[in-house]
Amino acid sequence: MPIISIILPVYNAGKYLRKCLDSLKVQTFPDIEILCVDDGSQDGSRRICEEYMLADKRFKLLSQPNSGPAAARNLGLRNAAGRYLMFCDADDWYQPDICEKLLKAITASQTDIAICGCRVIDEGEQVRPQEDIAYYRLYYSGKQQITGELIQRTNVMLWNKIFKADLVRQYGIDFPTGYEYDDNCFYWQYMCVAKTVCFLNEELYNYLRRNDSVMGKVYNRKNKGVYDSLYSLEYFYDFLRRNSLEKRHQRLFVDIYQNCWRFCTGFLDERQYAQAYKIFNRFRRILPPDVSSELKKHCCPRYLLRLGNFKLAEFICLNGKDGLTGCRLIDIRLVLFSKLTLFNLSLKNAVVRLKFCGLRILRLRQRK
């Protein structure tokens, strides 16, 4: 039985795959298995995996019709034999001693998870300095008790972490399929059942940031997955309830939800408003009243107007039910007022022109 199982989803990664597999093959800690999960590749990636499997028995090949990275990782979880779990993306690569050092960190510190640093590399092979990429920076060092603040200040990426397989199986931790940002949900689930963590401030993982990667598309308004974090929150809350953890982690859930909602409201497409609003209402109904009221203010048109999201504020005013928006008349007036824009102001001639919904409605001129 291997000590570490490394799960590697593979989909049309032929351009990068050999570099990734070579980095796994030369690990200084040899007692590993590499589960290459082919997600219906069409570019010869499967043949590359087969080549490595024939040359090194530690490589294993699993296959599925194209179903996305979450389903591929779940297939890897079901077939992993190791005591510890690690993940890698097919366009990234490990430093030669990442397995050895993370294993030593988690065992020596007797913690439930160990986390290392990473190097972020643009596709042109330019290494980005850590100060330019605050999200990936480690804000802790050594052994730490896991708190809500620590969970939120630590990046959710899977590839710079080592997990205990027993904890994953005990609590049924897995990935929500069909959505992007599935690694968020796995991370939240695991950290809610783990008690301690060890941080290793060494850059042992090389993350290639591509323009067409999930993270590269985060700030693209046309990306349909930009609000998938809301769906992953649904999955996360179901996990908490299934394991009777919702009360213990109520504060954490609310904080994560507010952060996700604040992020998503700036990027939602008008066609996505109804579904996002539906998810919001579901949480509002199942959470305790005090928590629900806290979430409620983040869907209030007044709050959304402050964020500059006029269209979503308008949508909620027109579709809000059950008193969600508080004093509906006030909110509607605020939304209408937000559409009242200063068209032209000339101090020299003392002329003011106003527009409403693009139509000029008022022109004032001071008498001489």
What does each of the following model-derived ranges do?
Residues Q64-A80:
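Glycine-rich, basic loop-to-helix element that forms the pyrophosphate-binding segment
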Residues L85:
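Short aromatic/hydrophobic "clamp" motif used to bind/position activated sugar donors
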Residues S23, P30, D38-R47, S67, ...:
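A conserved acidic beta->alpha catalytic loop
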Residues N12-V26:
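Short, well-formed alpha-helical segments that are part of the catalytic scaffolds
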Residues D31-G40, K60-P65, A90:
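Short beta-strand/loop segment that forms part of the nucleotide-sugar
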Residues P2-S5, S23, E33, C185:
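Cell-envelope/extracellular polymer assembly enzymes that use nucleotide-activated donors
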Residues E270-K368:
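Membrane-interface aromatic/basic loop that binds lipid-linked glycans or pyrophosphate carriers
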Residues P69, A90-K224:
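Donor-binding/catalytic cores of nucleotide-activated saccharide
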